[in-house]
Amino acid sequence: MATIHPPAYLLDQAKRRFTPSFNNFPGMSLVEHMLLNTKFPEKKLAEPPPGSGLKPVVGDAGLPILGHMIEMLRGGPDYLMFLYKTKGPVVFGDSAVLPGVAALGPDAAQVIYSNRNKDYSQQGWVPVIGPFFHRGLMLLDFEEHMFHRRIMQEAFVRSRLAGYLEQMDRVVSRVVADDWVVNDARFLVYPAMKALTLDIASMVFMGHEPGTDHELVTKVNKAFTITTRAGNAVIRTSVPPFTWWRGLRARELLENYFTARVKERREASGNDLLTVLCQTEDDDGNRFSDADIVNHMIFLMMAAHDTSTSTATTMAYQLAAHPEWQQRCRDESDRHGDGPLDIESLEQLESLDLVMNESIRLVTPVQWAMRQTVRDTELLGYYLPKGTNVIAYPGMNHRLPEIWTDPLTFDPERFTEPRNEHKRHRYAFTPFGGGVHKCIGMVFDQLEIKTILHRLLRRYRLELSRPDYQPRWDYSAMPIPMDGMPIVLRPR
C-alpha cells in the first residue's frame, strides 16, 4: 500500500510555503489591495485615423517593469472582472514585459475567435511561449494552420481515440489502485494527477510502456514541466540560472529526444500518437516532416497533460465539496462497473460531463487566448493598429453575472435544459477556445478526464481534508492549487 514519507512531505510543504512568489511573499495581499485602489496615469494605445469614428484604447502602465503582474497573478479572473467593470471591454496595458490590449466579455471573444476578416494572428503567443513551443499547431496561422490541422486530425478520429482510451485506462486503473495514498489528509491531489497524466502521455503519446525507460521518461517529463512554466518568467534572458534559460535548455532536450524517437517510429507499428503522426497523411498524401512532428509532439504533450491535470484536480475538489454530486456521478459509474471502458460507456456518464463543464467554468485551465493584429483594425469600435497584442480571457467570461446565475456557485445543472446558460451567448463558454483554432484534442482530454474520475469514484469516496477547506489558486500559468489540494481518499 502506498504511504507518505513524513520528511518528503514536510520538504514539499516547505517549498510550497516558502518559495518566494507574488502569492506567498509576506504583505502581498496588502500590496494587491493598494494597487487595486491606485489610479495610474492613463495613456492611449494609438490615435484612431481621422474621420474613422473609432475610439482610442486607453489604459496605463501600472508599476515600473512589473506593470499589473501582481494583480494578474494573484487575482486572475477576479482582477480581469475588476477591469471589465471599471474600464470596459477593451483595455490597454502598457506593460514593459508584454504590452497588449485586454479583450473582455463574450462580444470581444466572438470577434477574436471567429476572426472573420483574418485580422488576428496566433503570433500573439510567440512572446510568451514561442521559444519553448516553436511551431506547435496553436502557433500556426491561416492556410498553413489548416494544412497541418488536416493531417493531425487523422490522429484524433474516433477509431484512433478508442485505441488511446484502451491504453490510458490501463495506466489509470493501475495508478489509482496502487499508487495513491488512502485515509491520509496529507495526500495531495494535484501532484498525483500531474504524475498520472504524465504517465498517460508517456504511454499514449510517446509509446513507453508503464515502468519502462524510467530514467529517460522522468527526464523528459521534467523537461515538459520546466518548459510549461518558463513562459511566465519575469526575467527573459538566456543567461543561467534564470527560468527562461532553464526553459530553453529543456526545449533542447525535448527536441533531441523526439528527433531520435521519430527516426525509430517512422517505419514501426504502434497505436501511440507519435507513431500515428509519423505515418499519417491527408487525402492528398501529404505527411509531416520530421521537424514538424518534433514541434507538434512537444506542444501536444504540454497541451494534453496540463489541461487534464487542472480539470481533473478541480473536479476532485468539487466532488469532495459536494457529496450529493459525488454520489450522483458514482451511481452512474457503478452502473457500468469495473469492466473495460470504451467511448460509448464514457458517453453515458452524463453527470460527470456536467461536473466537468462546471469545474472548467469556475477554474478555466487556459485562462487567456493570445492574438496579434496583422493589419490596422477595430474591436468593438476601438482602434487597434497593426502589431497590437490582443488577449481574450475566457476565464473571466465564465464568471459574468449577466450570463451565469450566481456565477461563483457550483451548479452543474446550469448546463442542462431548460436553463442552458452556456448558450446565452455563442461565446459565453469557450474553455477549449473557438473558431478554427478550437482545441484539436478536446475529445481526447474529455475521455482522459472521465476515465480518471470514473476509476477514482469506483474505488474511493472523496472527502475534504477539513470541513472548511477552500483552495487558493496560483494564476501564474494554468491555475494551480497553491497547497497541492489535500483530499482524503476513503476506500469503499
UniProtKB/Swiss-Prot annotation:
EC number: 1.14.-.-
Record InterPro entries: Cyt_P450, Cyt_P450_CS, Cyt_P450_E_grp-IV, Cyt_P450_sf
Family of the protein in this entry: Belongs to the cytochrome P450 family.
SUPFAM superfamilies documented for this protein: Cytochrome P450
Protein name in the entry: Putative cytochrome P450 136
Required cofactor names: heme
Top-level EC class as recorded in UniProt: oxidoreductase
Xref: Pfam families: p450 (PF00067)
CDD domains per record: CYP136-like
Name of the gene encoding the protein in the UniProt record: cyp136
Alphabetical keyword list: Acetylation, Heme, Iron, Metal-binding, Monooxygenase, Oxidoreductase
N-acetylalanine: residues bearing it: A2
Residues annotated for heme binding in this entry: C439
A single GO molecular function term of this UniProt record: heme binding
